[in-house]
Structure formats: structure tokens, C-alpha cells
From Swiss-Prot:
Name of the protein described by the UniProt record: Probable FKBP-type peptidyl-prolyl cis-trans isomerase 2, chloroplastic
A GO cellular component annotation in the UniProt record: chloroplast thylakoid lumen
Organism: Spinacia oleracea
Catalytic activity entry: [protein]-peptidylproline (omega=180) = [protein]-peptidylproline (omega=0)
Function: PPIases accelerate the folding of proteins. It catalyzes the cis-trans isomerization of proline imidic peptide bonds in oligopeptides.
Subcellular location: Plastid, Chloroplast thylakoid lumen
Length: 17
């Protein structure tokens, strides 16, 4: 939701790209 994929790869896989 604004964090890098390293912090939450499950919530941020393509939305953080």
C-alpha cells in the first residue's frame, strides 16, 4: 500500500511496483 515489496511481499507484489 506504499511499502516496498521487501517489507510486505504478500500484500505488495505488483501494486508496489
Amino acid at each position: 500500500a506504499g511499502l516496498p515489496p521487501e517489507e510486505k511481499p504478500k500484500l505488495c507484489d505488483a501494486a508496489c511496483e
